[in-house]
Design a protein with these regions (language model features):
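N-terminal alpha-helical targeting/anchoring segments
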Residues: 1-102, 117, 121
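TRNA-recognition modules of translation machinery and tRNA-sensing kinases, especially anticodon-binding
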Residues: 98-396
Length: 396
């Protein structure tokens, strides 16, 4: 990186000197022609031509060097917050707090797809024929719960002062590289063939992209948005696609939240964001805990991150249902998201958090609300979105 930067500076100096020399020679040519010194003028013209060719070659090299610099810069990770625990991977994340009492009932809890099948609520076989592994059909009461959770989450966030947004479900490459690292992009994003467009892996990307190349007055901050969207992911990472179930899949829906704010306010907003997710899950009677992500589990652009995990009575452990991240000014720097204040312009901070991703929520919801008779209790907060139903009854 340093060597390329040095060469880039050298090229710029060379080009500047050559252009100054060309201007000087060009002025001389006119004088030589007036003096009738045609041979000297022709020699000067040859120097101008050679000069222009050298400038063209150096300019091409400059462009190539700057592209290499940009590529390397995109791989340089953010500076993590001093409070982040040091660790090699997610096995060294640190539990922060538990909310709600984890319960393991006296009766056996089946795998989540087995519960869904009792309600004729899922068809993985047909989805496999239509789209392959990593897709599903949800039907009947299970599909209703899915939609009810999304609607409830939307209203939950609106009541907390967030502006509801339905964003584009495709974004251009400059937005993709503005919000994530190349490694994340390769593992997650589906590209539209023949187009400079990618299917979003999360609506955070298109919501943050809304502020590309903007300058927002301080008094208009923070910008707080919550959105619903389908999400599409290749899931090429270490975990891959789940062979059976809806925990890790190619297509799912999600309610997301983002904040664009002043740098000094981002720690406060970080805590508010993950607390929103905790409060939503607790309002649906699902025990959760928060984990502080260690340094080895942070994506390149993240300054600090907290995972929210829900209790699984079947597995007798917690599993991830959402992630809250403070990106500092990393995304703002790449996308040109600036703020104007009394002392001039500066980069904003951006944050994002999962409100709820219903496929994973469904797992926690069904396991924590399953009754011994096979019915699934509908928590009181969700009943208005389920036509007043207090429970769903299995059909088999």
């Amino acid at each position: 990186m340093i060597e390329l930067d040095k060469r880039n500076r050298e090229i710029k100096q060379e080009v500047e000197a050559l252009r100054a020399e060309r201007n000087k020679i060009s002025k001389m040519i006119g004088g030589l022609m007036k003096q009738g010194k045609k041979e000297e003028a022709e020699e000067a013209k040859k120097k101008v031509t050679a000069n222009a060719e050298t400038v063209e070659r150096l300019s091409a090299e400059e462009k190539e060097v700057e592209e290499k610099i940009k590529t390397i810069m995109m791989t340089i990770p953010n500076i993590i917050d001093p409070s982040v625990p040091i660790g090699k991977d997610d096995s060294e994340n640190v539990e922060v707090q538990k909310y709600g009492e984890p319960v393991v009932p006296d009766f056996e809890i089946p795998y989540h797809t087995d519960i869904m099948e009792r309600f004729n609520g899922i068809d993985l076989t047909s989805a496999g024929k239509v789209a392959g592994n990593g897709f599903y059909y949800l039907m009947g009461d299970i599909a209703r719960i899915h939609s009810a959770v999304i609607s409830y989450a939307r209203d939950f966030m609106i009541n907390r002062g967030f502006t509801y947004c339905i964003p584009p479900f495709m974004i251009r490459s400059n937005v993709v590289t503005g919000v994530m690292s190349f490694a994340e992009m390769d593992a997650m994003m589906y590209k539209i063939e023949g187009e400079d467009l990618y299917l979003i892996g999360t609506s955070e990307h298109s919501m943050i992209g809304k502020f590309i190349d903007t300058i927002t007055p301080e008094e208009e901050l923070p910008k707080t948005l919550t959105s619903y969207s389908p999400c599409f992911r290749k899931e090429k990472g270490a975990h891959g696609i789940e062979e059976r179930g809806v925990y890790r899949i190619h297509q799912f829906e999600k309610q997301e939240m983002i904040v664009v704010c002043k740098p000094e306010e981002s720690p406060m907003w970080f805590d508010k964001l993950w607390q929103n997710t905790v409060d939503l899950f607790r309002s649906l009677d699902i025990p959760v805990r928060t984990l502080e992500c260690c340094s080895g589990d942070l994506a390149d652009l993240k300054v600090k991150s907290v995972d929210v995990e829900a209790w699984s009575p079947r597995q007798k452990k917690y599993f991830e249902v959402g992630s809250c991240s403070n990106l500092g000014d990393a995304q703002a720097r790449r996308l040109g998201i600036r703020v104007s204040g009394p002392d001039g312009k500066y980069l904003a901070h951006t944050l994002n958090n999962t409100v709820v991703a219903p496929p994973r929520m469904l797992i926690a919801f069904l396991e924590n609300n399953l009754q011994e008779d096979g019915s699934v209790r509908i928590p009181e907060a969700l009943r208005p979105y389920m036509g007043g139903m207090e429970a769903i009854i299995p059909s088999k």
